[in-house]
């Protein structure tokens, strides 16, 4: 299906503002049933879940990580803490709620990403990757290593709408993913949580295609390809 590609948010420089804007778009989608797509990036940070904010030393962890250059932000979708930065491209799909099948929306989310990977000569699949951050059965995986994490948030039906689904993916395009993995673990260590993640469980597109150019150039190329796939709707059906 073709998506309406939402414009970059010039004033939304922080993840908090970007994520808040997506909640407005989600309500718009619930009312008009038009699928939308949003490609975005965040500066270096960790984005955690509402559940994580209830950890016993959460506030102290946020203060320490901000001092180390990894400020903490909160999202409404599920999962665990995840790293963000210049080498990570995020895809958010805002979808009308047409079924209660979680897998349906994850496959809609995965379709353009799998097509993108194929354009780079890579074959991805869905699978768990034990030890990776935000692990789940709808990770996109290459050679047993995670290249995309996924999550969802549902807006329940209301009096004037049938509900909508926000499906989010973070594509690891470039950068030091092991450092990001270590910092996600450090959040839980500092906050008093039990989760820990293992370096070597994730990979990047740059690693997989042996990219020799700049990380920014690769991210720009990926963004352009994904924008084309999303707006033209030339992906296999989920």
Question: How should these model regions be labeled?
Answer:
Residues 56-59, 99-104, 177-182, 214-215:
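Short, conserved charged micro-motifs
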